């Protein structure tokens, strides 16, 4: 079984070990992941971000970010599921979402076929009502 905390070490350089990000440069995950998971389509969006990256302006907790998140498509499906489970649980976000179910490799595999660009992932974010 993949170790999500260990895989997250690749994310911590930008999003920080505590999930707080770097204001103005890299958005926080802690607290924001719950907001995403609470939206219909939020689970799929989080998977898409890891598979295809994200590019363009977003807003998290009132702060704007305009950068590029790289794709992590090189990770195996079970590794992507494991790191998503880590970010959903490490800072208590999953507890804020009614009926949270752990991410699975099967969910990741289904979305891997989409072949989106980072800009298309941004469009998916906007469909969720997130800035």
From Swiss-Prot:
UniProt xrefs under Pfam families: Cytochrom_C
On modification after translation, the UniProt record reads: Binds 1 heme c group covalently per subunit.
**GO molecular function terms listed in the Swiss-Prot or TrEMBL record:** electron transfer activity; heme binding; metal ion binding
PROSITE patterns, per database record? CYTC
Q: Which Gene3D superfamilies match?
A: Cytochrome c-like domain
- Residues holding heme c: 11, 14-15, 69
* Main function: This monoheme basic protein appears to function as an electron donor to cytochrome oxidase in T.thermophilus.
The molecule here is called Cytochrome c-552
Source organism per UniProt = Thermus thermophilus
**Its gene?**
cycA
